[in-house]
Amino acid sequence: MPNTLQDRFFTTCDAALRTLFVTPHAERACPTLPGEATALTDAEKVQSGALMRVNHVGEVCAQALYTAQAFATKNEALRAHFTKASADETNHLAWTQQRLDELGARPSLLNPLWYGAAFGLGLLAGRLGDPISLGFVVETENQVEAHLESHLSLLPANDHASRAIVAQMKDDEVRHALDAQKAGAVPLPPPVKSLMTAAAKVMTTVAHRI
């Protein structure tokens, strides 16, 4: 675990480059439903591709958030917590990338922008103190959980592959929120939650198309 500021800086840069320019590799097998084949029409592939692109962007942002928060905290135990959560999100990043490839869809062209914006938010949250930083995690994961739940109703009913991935991601986000609460998160003020919701809406709307 890097301890010096210089070590953390280079680790943070490495994480950004890997997220944006290197094909991610999952440590956990991609979720699937045994015996459930996925046969989609062209229109359904387009629909699923757009939704999974949004989910992929969400995982790019998750990498940025956790990396920034790990960089900002001075608490070694909390840094390890953020690093572990980031590793979980790497699985999600790999799964969504794999599914995009299978659907013949591309990731968002604006991923560097999304990463930079999310990193800035994570760094700001981290500078405000560990309890607030953890509260930011709780609210983010709660919003992501709700977003993934909505995608389960929007994905084609017979897109079993995408649905299995989204369902597992949703379960993992619930666990991340609970872990952050146990680590000492404080609730964020309602105006902050509203701003986060508005920012997420912009991201999901744009990423659905670009």
Curated annotation (Swiss-Prot):
GO biological process: ubiquinone biosynthetic process
E.C. designation(s): 1.14.99.60
Tree of life domain: Bacteria
A single Gene Ontology CC term: plasma membrane
Positions that bind Fe cation 1: E59, E89, H92, E173
Gene3D superfamilies for this protein: 1.20.1260.10
InterPro entries named among the record's database cross-references: COQ7_proteobact, Ferritin-like, Ferritin-like_SF, Ubq_synth_Coq7
Cofactor(s) required for function per UniProt: Fe cation
Pathway: Cofactor biosynthesis; ubiquinone biosynthesis
Membrane topology (UniProt): Peripheral membrane protein
GO MF, one example: 3-demethoxyubiquinol 3-hydroxylase activity
Keyword terms of this UniProt record: Cell membrane, Iron, Membrane, Metal-binding, Monooxygenase, Oxidoreductase, Ubiquinone biosynthesis
Subcellular location: Cell membrane
Note on how the cofactor is bound: Binds 2 iron ions per subunit.
Enzyme class: oxidoreductase
NCBIfam families xrefs: DMQ_monoox_COQ7 (NF033656)
Family, similarity comment: Belongs to the COQ7 family.
HAMAP family the UniProt entry points to: COQ7
Function statement: Catalyzes the hydroxylation of 2-nonaprenyl-3-methyl-6-methoxy-1,4-benzoquinol during ubiquinone biosynthesis.
Protein name: 3-demethoxyubiquinol 3-hydroxylase
Protein's organism: Albidiferax ferrireducens (strain ATCC BAA-621 / DSM 15236 / T118) (Rhodoferax ferrireducens)
